[in-house]
Amino acid sequence: MVKMYYEADVKQEVLRGKTIAIIGYGSQGHAQAQNLRDSGYKVVVGLRPGKSWDVAAKDGFEVLTVAEATKRADVVQILMPDERQAQVYRDEIAPNLKSGAALCFSHGFNIHYAQIVPPADVDVIMAAPKSPGHLVRRVYQEGFGVPGLIAIYQDATGNAKDLALAYSSGIGCTKAGVIETSFREETETDLFGEQAVLCGGASELVKAGFDTLVEAGYAPEIAYFECLHELKLIVDLMYEGGLARMRYSISDTAEYGDYSTGRRIITDETRKEMKKVLAEIQDGTFARNWILENQANRPGFTSRRRLESEHGIEVVGEQLRGMMSWINKDTKKEEVKIGQ
């Protein structure tokens, strides 16, 4: 069984009086910075000039260059996109990192795949909320917290675990519960979930269902509702109570179709391919390909993004979502928060 930690396990004094630098002010950056400040910790934000600088300043933070924020900080939480972290670390963080400080991450990609190699005299920890930033912030403001993960990669001071727990408490996670993991486990399972299920798997399944109905002569609008729009209804039920809650809530006809058809779609061959995907994550193949793609200025990524945006489901979806005022309102409200 995994080890769970809660508020009673936290030694907040290990973080009191320290300066925390949040590097990046996107989805997680804005939420973690504000939660930590509201928990009574001293927070500065390290950024390069741009939109996020103005947003962080408007939110009342002292905004510094990444180099200056690192010089000032006892804890440096790197919350920039994975593909930008290594260069920013080499150019601006590493030369200014204090001995005995802590490097903190919310995803282990750059540590696990050695794109960031920290010096031996700093702690390297993870504090990873298992929710998007806007939810991390909203739930904290309601007096609660979202679940999270902690991991220790390097314990130079002997206080790394206590520091990870105190940081997690500062952003609200120990109110819900924090699971101890490793940088390897978090990185590999996170990438697999994204690729095989949440993003790659789900998007291809949705498109395949949409295409099947449209090619059979059904209206694209109806296909969109059946294969994409209603997915949220099902996922929300799973989120609230697992597969059992979902199956309890749907009709018996839908439940019978689940049992009789599901394994015809996700076949043994699909499961074998999932194992190949996991192996490519474990042996570094995916990481190498993604790093090289970025070094080449993302030609394949950019091309695929354009092609996907032209798929029929996007065309009809844009029209139908225009009828849904609540979606447009919610999207606009979070637009600033999720931009990097």
Curated annotation (Swiss-Prot):
- Which PROSITE patterns does UniProt cross-reference here? KARI_C, KARI_N
Q: Which GO terms describe its biological process?
A: isoleucine biosynthetic process; L-valine biosynthetic process
Q: Which reaction does it catalyse?
A: (2R)-2,3-dihydroxy-3-methylbutanoate + NADP(+) = (2S)-2-acetolactate + NADPH + H(+); (2R,3R)-2,3-dihydroxy-3-methylpentanoate + NADP(+) = (S)-2-ethyl-2-hydroxy-3-oxobutanoate + NADPH + H(+)
- Give yes or no: UniProt keyword Hydrolase: no
Lineage, top-rank taxon, reads: Bacteria
Q: What is the cofactor note?
A: Binds 2 magnesium ions per subunit.
Recorded protein name is Ketol-acid reductoisomerase (NADP(+))
Using the record's annotation, list all stretches that form the KARI N-terminal Rossmann domain: 2-181
Q: Where does Mg(2+) 2 bind?
A: 190, 226, 230
Native species: Brevibacillus brevis (strain 47 / JCM 6285 / NBRC 100599)
E.C. numbers: 1.1.1.86
Q: Which residues form the KARI C-terminal knotted domain?
A: 182-327
The residues responsible for catalysis, as annotated, are 107
Residues noted as binding NADP(+) in the record, renumbered to the chain: 25-28, 48, 52, 82-85, 133
Residues at which Mg(2+) 1 binds: 190, 194
NADP as a keyword?
yes
**Which pathway does the protein contribute to?**
Amino-acid biosynthesis; L-isoleucine biosynthesis; L-isoleucine from 2-oxobutanoate: step 2/4; Amino-acid biosynthesis; L-valine biosynthesis; L-valine from pyruvate: step 2/4
Q: Which residues bind substrate?
A: 251
State the function annotated in the UniProt record: Involved in the biosynthesis of branched-chain amino acids (BCAA). Catalyzes an alkyl-migration followed by a ketol-acid reduction of (S)-2-acetolactate (S2AL) to yield (R)-2,3-dihydroxy-isovalerate. In the isomerase reaction, S2AL is rearranged via a Mg-dependent methyl migration to produce 3-hydroxy-3-methyl-2-ketobutyrate (HMKB). In the reductase reaction, this 2-ketoacid undergoes a metal-dependent reduction by NADPH to yield (R)-2,3-dihydroxy-isovalerate.
Q: What class of enzyme is it?
A: oxidoreductase
What does the UniProt keyword field contain? Amino-acid biosynthesis, Branched-chain amino acid biosynthesis, Magnesium, Metal-binding, NADP, Oxidoreductase
A Gene Ontology MF term for this entry? ketol-acid reductoisomerase activity
Q: Name one GO cellular component term.
A: cytosol
